[in-house]
């Protein structure tokens, strides 16, 4: 299967070019930058409960806030204070003009330009089930910004609504180049922006009434409330097809198909659409892996895993509709920077630990952890993708012998053919952490056979910059005996290691209450600047497939693949 970018191995690129990583030695604060909601129940211990299927459209309108304040001990940034002094009446004048918050065709650019005139007022990141919208203020003041913004989200399961308020510390560099949906390009979110607090709640999808509440802000400055109006419209049994989407950009390609950025025509939400040609996966005996990916994605209920929104099919193709995570692959950032500092490496590996723990709770082994399969969201949190190599129905005592994965990350028990368990994922977590800290996997060699020999026999060595706690953790994760490997008794043993225990509150991390140490440069929900131009410059087309004459028996293998927006959460089709 494929992630969102294919074919380029980092060992052939920037890691060997001598580029240095940018230092960032600040520990993450306990102030949430992310607004990604935890679907369903936000508590890790209850995460084995699959998401409750629901379908329809959720309209969220955020009007304004009141009583917001800066975090204790933080003063108004100088550029913001200067803007307030220079333009004392602009914000209030714009706020009193007729709101154009519901962005539609003719008024889209005017709405966006109005918002950009008052960049110094708090902006909002609104999110539902990993679909994110950045909303600049129309007017008001620092304590009481006015947004008057509405957005419609697709509902495929019960999830939380979250909204986080930030204050820029400087004016965005780029002039807003307007998009057709009213979202401008520019440096909208800065890594130094101040979090003023957030709200999180689960909407009542059993009621058809509009709720209108002032929700108390948590974190940040610790004061104030935000007015949110919510209404839900159940689905009417519509069947999804490729015509339900506007194709925007190609963001990845593979032998089985491609991944495109798309906009759903009715709600205008942005998604990643993965297309898979049936004939290719049938000819390569990959049907089981493909169906496993769909099964896992429909089950997961974790804030660090890309959720499946819908799936549907035609006679020739399968389609997976996923949340579009546009901060780029970890591969992209690691290749550019060479390596990460310990704080950043710890943050990513801790979130991955929670994602793998969640998969293991469903008796699923991931088996393909690597930087290419890890995405960064708007705010800098990770999102694990590409579940084509997952192995299902693996209890703690079960073993499997399938030889699969990426050479640099293969565990010794897999290479030796003795069978392996869930512990194989802890080995790959160790390899990834080592690579983030040093720039290369621990046993890397350009000759694959020599690399396999090193994985099986070479002593584990560390560069001088790797500190003692990290060395201890890596030694435990990279134990060649899976029966002695750290994590053999469960993820909690890894969480308890000083490398994590001294620095990470895993409950806060699960609830997105720890600010990521890095935020990718993302201008808007449709920004694809973090993806390879080799793909994004290609014209997005759902290419015609020659009639493959798949028999009815073969087509029956794909029954149950479709998962869409009918009242029962299923879009059923036979071909």
UniProtKB/Swiss-Prot annotation:
Gene3D superfamilies xref list: Phosphorylase Kinase, domain 1 (3.30.200.20), Transferase(Phosphotransferase) domain 1 (1.10.510.10)
UniProt keyword annotation of Nucleotide-binding present: yes
Binding positions (ATP): 251-259, 274
Reactions catalysed: L-seryl-[protein] + ATP = O-phospho-L-seryl-[protein] + ADP + H(+); L-threonyl-[protein] + ATP = O-phospho-L-threonyl-[protein] + ADP + H(+)
Ranges of compositional bias, category Low complexity: 23-38
The enzyme's E.C. designation: 2.7.11.1
CDD domains on file: STKc_YPK1_like, YPK1_N_like
Record has Nucleotide-binding as a keyword: yes
Impact reported for residue 386 to A: Sensitive to fluconazole (cell wall stress inducer)
Annotated AGC-kinase C-terminal domain residues: 502-573
Gene Ontology MF, one: protein serine kinase activity
Record region (Disordered): 1-53
Domain Protein kinase: 245-500
Entries under InterPro entries matching the protein: AGC-kinase_C (IPR000961), Kinase-like_dom_sf (IPR011009), Pkinase_C (IPR017892), Prot_kinase_dom (IPR000719), Protein_kinase_ATP_BS (IPR017441), Ser/Thr_kinase_AS (IPR008271)
Keywords: ATP-binding, Kinase, Nucleotide-binding, Phosphoprotein, Serine/threonine-protein kinase, Transferase
Positions of the catalytic residues: 368 (proton acceptor)
Phenotype upon gene inactivation: Decreases virulence in a mouse systemic infection model. Sensitive to: high temperature; sirolimus; fluconazole; myriocin (phytosphingosine biosynthesis inhibitor); aureobasidin A (inositol-containing sphingolipid biosynthesis inhibitor); phytosphingosine. Abnormal sphingolipid metabolism.
Residues with the Phosphoserine modification: 543, 562
Gene Ontology terms describing biological process: regulation of sphingolipid biosynthetic process
Transmembrane regions listed in the UniProt entry: none
Class of this enzyme: transferase
Record-stated family: Belongs to the protein kinase superfamily. AGC Ser/Thr protein kinase family. RAC subfamily.
Alphabetized PANTHER family for the sequence: RIBOSOMAL PROTEIN S6 KINASE
Function: Probable serine/threonine-protein kinase which may act in the sphingolipid-mediated signaling pathway. May act downstream of TORC2 (TOR complex 2) and PDK1 to regulate sphingolipid metabolism.
Protein name (Swiss-Prot/TrEMBL): Serine/threonine-protein kinase YPK1
Organism: Cryptococcus neoformans var. grubii serotype A (strain H99 / ATCC 208821 / CBS 10515 / FGSC 9487)
């Amino acid at each position: 299967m494929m992630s969102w970018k294919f074919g380029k191995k980092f060992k052939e690129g920037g890691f060997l070019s001598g580029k240095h990583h940018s230092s960032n030695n600040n520990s993450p604060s306990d102030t949430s930058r992310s607004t990604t909601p935890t679907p369903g129940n936000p508590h890790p211990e209850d995460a084995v409960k699959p998401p409750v299927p629901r379908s329809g459209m959720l309209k969220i309108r955020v009007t304004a806030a009141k009583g917001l304040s800066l975090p204790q001990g933080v003063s108004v940034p100088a550029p913001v204070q200067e803007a307030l002094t220079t333009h004392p009446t602009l914000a209030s004048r714009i706020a009193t003009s007729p709101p154009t918050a519901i962005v539609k065709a003719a008024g889209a650019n005017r709405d966006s330009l109005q918002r950009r005139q008052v960049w110094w007022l708090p902006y909002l990141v609104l999110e539902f089930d990993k679909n994110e919208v950045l909303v600049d203020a129309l007017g008001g003041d620092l304590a009481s910004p006015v947004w008057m913004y509405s957005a419609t989200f697709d509902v495929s399961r019960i999830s939380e609504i979250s909204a986080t308020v930030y204050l820029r510390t400087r004016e965005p560099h780029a002039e807003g180049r307007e998009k057709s949906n009213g979202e401008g390009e520019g440096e909208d979110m800065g890594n130094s922006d101040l979090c003023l607090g957030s709200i999180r709640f689960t909407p009542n999808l059993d009621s058809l009434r509009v709720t209108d509440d002032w929700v108390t802000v948590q974190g940040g400055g610790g004061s104030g409330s935000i007015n949110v109006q919510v209404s839900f419209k159940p689905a009417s049994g519509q069947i999804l097809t490729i015509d339900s989407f506007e194709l925007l950009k190609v963001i990845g390609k593979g032998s089985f198909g491609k991944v495109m950025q798309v906009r759903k025509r009715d709600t205008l939400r942005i998604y990643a659409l993965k297309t898979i040609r049936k004939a290719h996966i049938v000819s390569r005996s990959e049907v089981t892996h493909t169906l496993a990916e769909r099964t896992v994605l429909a089950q997961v209920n974790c804030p660090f895993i890309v959720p499946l929104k819908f799936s549907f099919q035609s006679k020739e193709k399968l389609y997976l509709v996923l949340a579009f995570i546009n901060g780029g692959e970890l591969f992209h950032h690691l290749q550019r920077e060479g390596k990460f500092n310990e704080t950043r490496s710890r943050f990513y590996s801790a979130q991955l630990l929670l994602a793998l723990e969640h998969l293991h709770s469903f008796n699923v082994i991931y088996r393909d952890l690597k930087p290419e399969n890890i995405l960064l969201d708007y705010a800098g949190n990770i999102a694990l993708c590409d579940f084509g190599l997952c192995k299902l129905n693996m209890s703690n005592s079960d073993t499997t012998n399938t030889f699969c994965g990426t050479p640099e990350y293969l565990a010794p028990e897999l290479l030796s053919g003795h069978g392996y368990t869930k512990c194989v994922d802890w080995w790959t977590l160790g390899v990834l952490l080592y690579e983030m800290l040093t720039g290369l996997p621990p046993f890397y060699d350009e000759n694959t056979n020599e690399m396999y020999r090193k994985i099986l026999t070479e002593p584990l060595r560390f560069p001088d910059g790797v500190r003692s706690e990290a060395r201890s953790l890596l030694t435990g994760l990279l134990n060649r005996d899976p029966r002695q490997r750290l994590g053999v008794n469960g993820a909690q043993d890894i969480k308890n290691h000083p490398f994590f225990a001294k620095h990470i509150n895993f409950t806060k991390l699960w609830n997105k209450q720890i600010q990521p140490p890095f935020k990718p440069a993302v201008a808007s929900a449709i920004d694809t600047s973090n993806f390879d131009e080799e793909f994004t410059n290609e014209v997005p087309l759902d290419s015609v497939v020659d009639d493959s004459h798949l028999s009815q028996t073969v087509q029956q293998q794909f029954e149950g693949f479709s998962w869409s927006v009918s009242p029962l959460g299923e879009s059923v089709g036979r071909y």
